[in-house]
From Swiss-Prot:
A motif (JAMM motif) lies at residues 113-126. The lineage of its organism: Eukaryota, Metazoa, Chordata, Craniata, Vertebrata. CDD domains: MPN_RPN11_CSN5 (cd08069). Component of the 19S proteasome regulatory particle complex. The 26S proteasome consists of a 20S core particle (CP) and two 19S regulatory subunits (RP). The regulatory particle is made of a lid composed of 9 subunits including PSMD4, a base containing 6 ATPases and few additional components. Within the complex, PSMD4 interacts with subunit PSMD7 through their respective MPN domain. Interacts with TXNL1. This is 26S proteasome non-ATPase regulatory subunit 14. It comes from Homo sapiens. InterPro entries: JAMM/MPN+_dom (IPR000555), JAMM_MPN+_peptidase_M67A (IPR050242), MPN (IPR037518), RPN11_C (IPR056263).
Amino acid sequence: MDRLLRLGGGMPGLGQGPPTDAPAVDTAEQVYISSLALLKMLKHGRAGVPMEVMGLMLGEFVDDYTVRVIDVFAMPQSGTGVSVEAVDPVFQAKMLDMLKQTGRPEMVVGWYHSHPGFGCWLSGVDINTQQSFEALSERAVAVVVDPIQSVKGKVVIDAFRLINANMMVLGHEPRQTTSNLGHLNKPSIQALIHGLNRHYYSITINYRKNELEQKMLLNLHKKSWMEGLTLQDYSEHCKHNESVVKEMLELAKNYNKAVEEEDKMTPEQLAIKNVGKQDPKRHLEEHVDVLMTSNIVQCLAAMLDTVVFK
């Protein structure tokens, strides 16, 4: 019986074959996406909702374990799906030539597309598109981003690469993990249903920011000194003042009532009297502070406008 298994080991379907020392595909590879590329992918994906959009990623293959994505650009296409026909070679060549003139000499390292609202995985059409990219470069990466499920502080994004079908037929282990970099992401049930770890595998995504990129991100929603002198509409400002004063009146009544009740309470009751309840004193102080600040700024801005633009 052992002899029969050894004889059939080298044939597909009859055994796993003799163990060899041939190197397997290593999944210690990481994709480093720049902040600019991530923002452009999310902006492009949100602009195309509810349609799928796609584009190409520019970067470099630093070594066997590092893929760096520096920039992306959108590809023109129409329809609900992303297919191979959506890659326009003429547009791609012209775009790369123009990017080289602006100091972007990087090569195409893969492509990205959006799945608005239904998670990160590769469909049959996406797998065919990825096959065409891997025919040009074996290390091409397919990035999927979900602009609907992405929120501030958590981007729903994943990177994939196809598994060689010949390895699966021969019964070989398609890949191995030999690194402790990054962390494992639990795959979603949708991705497992659509062939994750059977037809394609996930690659760890990391974000490496330099000092200039950190400054750029910090300045995205930074307020300037001019915004403090912006005049509000007078009717809206009066309505806001009126509503805040009404709230302050209710809070003052509640605070007066709470002070009267404190005289009749024991020290044990005083310690827990505000647990799970609104503290009228603290909220009253906050309302007074906000109301005074807004009115002072409004009056100051109105005076400056009168003096400067009279």
